[in-house]
Amino acid sequence: MSLRDDLTINERDPLLSSFDQRQEYNTSNNTYKVNNNSNEPSVLTLYNSDELGTSQRSSYQKFVRRSQEFKMQHREFLAEFIGTLILVLLTCGFCAEQTLNIEKSKSWLTSSLGSGLSVLIGICVAGHVSGGHLNPAITIAFWVFSGFPIRKVPMYITAQLLGAFSGAALLYSIVEPAISQFDHGKRQILGELGTAGIFGTYPPLYVGTGSAVASEVVGTAMLLLVVMVTGHPNNLPFRTAQGAMIALGVTTISLCIGYTSGFSLNPARDFGPRLFTAVAGWGIDVFTVHHYYALVPMFAPILGGLAGGFIYTVFID
């Protein structure tokens, strides 16, 4: 989308008006700059102001026009990317606070509240543009049960994965000194000095794979129920506050059954940060530890999302 043709240059951007506010210094379209330093000879600098101003205006207009066109062509991708980046940055930030807290006053309540608030802020950022999926499980369930265009599915999931990876990288750039202070510069996945859990989700060692899968499937199914129910056109009391209701749902699910799996419900939220840790010093073992547990948050939420969408479509809608 191009800029409106009926706007003048100064109306489009007040910054450009500065080119037109120097006329009092111009004589016959030429501008003279005089060095008034009494200790040095006067120096006259001559340049054609109209040519310079026109060139800069033209370059700036082209940049703005191309930026606007790029944004309009990819606005849903950008919204999902930025929304997921914020979600992961804040969610993992809460995990970092819990892991690196020298007081050792860890609380699952704090982690659960952090997850819910992070989802709320991510939806606030992206919801009005892309719908605020921020989760491949939601995107796939919407495609299967709600008529979401299949051509957009790969684009949404790609944006979510890239946003999650970027959010983890941004957080690492902030908390890296604290991590190095905590683990003495030796990156560990699990154990007392393990820090990979800041980014990826890891269940307690005593939890079996079956229990973790059940937690992710049931939790994501309930999340999809909340998303679809609060988004129904006839559910006005909750539709107007859908973002807050989804955030409350995430917090509640986390408090009730999230601890057994490390709580993901979102393949992008786990895979993006896990991939980052693999290249940032923790090594490829982040994908193989705990009997290849990385496969659970990668695929179980998708199954849960489909189950939740099926239950809503068949029994509720």
Curated annotation (Swiss-Prot):
Gene Ontology CC annotation, any one: plasma membrane
Gene Ontology terms for molecular function: glycerol channel activity; water channel activity
Location (main, coarse): membrane
Transmembrane segments: 76-96, 109-129, 155-175, 209-229, 243-263, 296-316
Location of the motif NPA 1: 135-137
Membrane topology: Multi-pass membrane protein
Disulfide linkage: none
Keyword terms, alphabetized: Cell membrane, Membrane, Repeat, Transmembrane, Transmembrane helix, Transport
Subcellular location: Cell membrane
InterPro entries: Aquaporin-like (IPR023271), MIP (IPR000425), MIP/Aquaporin (IPR050363), MIP_CS (IPR022357)
Reactions it catalyzes: H2O(in) = H2O(out); glycerol(in) = glycerol(out)
Motif annotated as NPA 2, chain positions: 266-268
Residue spans, topological domain Extracellular: 97-108, 176-208, 264-295
Stated induction or repression of this protein's expression: Expression is relatively low at the spore resting stage and increases steadily from the induction of germination to a peak after 180 minutes, at the onset of the polar growth stage.
Cytoplasmic side: 1-75, 130-154, 230-242, 317
Role played: Water channel required to facilitate the transport of water across membranes. Contributes to water uptake of spores during the early stages of spore germination. Aquaporins AQP1 and AQP2 act as extracellular pH sensors and enable the spores to hydrate under favorable conditions and to commence germination. Wounded vegetables and fruit present acidic pH, so the optimal pH range for germination is adapted to the relevant host pH.
Database matches in PANTHER family: AQUAPORIN OR AQUAGLYCEROPORIN RELATED, AQUAPORIN-9
NCBIfam families: MIP
Domain notes: Aquaporins contain two tandem repeats each containing three membrane-spanning domains and a pore-forming loop with the signature motif Asn-Pro-Ala (NPA).
Recorded family membership: Belongs to the MIP/aquaporin (TC 1.A.8) family.
Name of the protein described by the UniProt record: Aquaporin-2
Species for this entry: Rhizopus delemar (strain RA 99-880 / ATCC MYA-4621 / FGSC 9543 / NRRL 43880)
Upper lineage: Eukaryota, Fungi, Fungi incertae sedis, Mucoromycota, Mucoromycotina
